[in-house]
């Protein structure tokens, strides 16, 4: 029996952060899920996955994440989900270089899962479509499909109805207050506003951007409130997702860096530019065209 085809060698893949430039909660369904309207944009900053496909049939991941069992790790779950969906006999060694915080609202875990799906679909030559990868991703998390598709998007429904958009690619100063916030804790909070009127995209893009989770997060987490109040002195600033990260927007890298330089040394923060095409999609295209090659 012939060995399954695969791309040999070691490959390196970006796992970019995202921002919710706005986030509105327009209702709550009987199953507890929320109807949203949100605008996703990627950043040119994130984690990195080094992946080598092999014939072992096993998925190895290093380093192990503290307090997260391998079977619960989204990277492992994504690899196994693709393996099962494509009925692939292949395996992979995956190394994660982690810089994005967990519980930060910038998509760290969802982005890792999406990068795993996109990379292994290529390396294992499984040939699944973008729609199929998005469907697998949705079972892993509501934000995974936007990362697998790789385009800035306006999302509706529970976040799965995506329309490609091209917001301005501004510069952002992203600050991580010293607290991790579980999405579930915010979406189940009794004081969360859930009745924002649904609007069309044109209206949303021409009104000041807001985040319906921001008020409750600021009241529950003084660290977030303090950091956001500080940023608002310098530029339009908001919470992303359910936090804990907050961001300020600027028209130039120079302006963002100037405010970054004023932060205390013990504050976790970075400056990045918005990207309407994900660095992941660009890397995939570069591998497919042999612009970059495995080593």
UniProtKB/Swiss-Prot annotation:
It is an enzyme of class 2 (transferase). One of its GO terms (molecular function) is 4-(cytidine 5'-diphospho)-2-C-methyl-D-erythritol kinase activity. It comes from the Bacteria. Pfam families: GHMP_kinases_C, GHMP_kinases_N. It catalyses: 4-CDP-2-C-methyl-D-erythritol + ATP = 4-CDP-2-C-methyl-D-erythritol 2-phosphate + ADP + H(+). The active site is at 18, 143. Its EC number is 2.7.1.148. Keywords: ATP-binding, Isoprene biosynthesis, Kinase, Nucleotide-binding, Transferase. Pathway: Isoprenoid biosynthesis; isopentenyl diphosphate biosynthesis via DXP pathway; isopentenyl diphosphate from 1-deoxy-D-xylulose 5-phosphate: step 3/6. ATP binds at residues 101-111. One of its GO terms (biological process) is isopentenyl diphosphate biosynthetic process, methylerythritol 4-phosphate pathway. Gene3D superfamilies: 3.30.230.10, GHMP kinase, C-terminal domain. InterPro entries: GHMP_kinase_C_dom (IPR013750), GHMP_kinase_C_sf (IPR036554), GHMP_kinase_N_dom (IPR006204), IspE (IPR004424), Ribosomal_Su5_D2-typ_SF (IPR020568), Ribsml_uS5_D2-typ_fold_subgr (IPR014721). Catalyzes the phosphorylation of the position 2 hydroxy group of 4-diphosphocytidyl-2C-methyl-D-erythritol. Belongs to the GHMP kinase family. IspE subfamily. This is 4-diphosphocytidyl-2-C-methyl-D-erythritol kinase. The lineage of its organism: Bacteria, Pseudomonadati, Pseudomonadota, Gammaproteobacteria, Vibrionales.
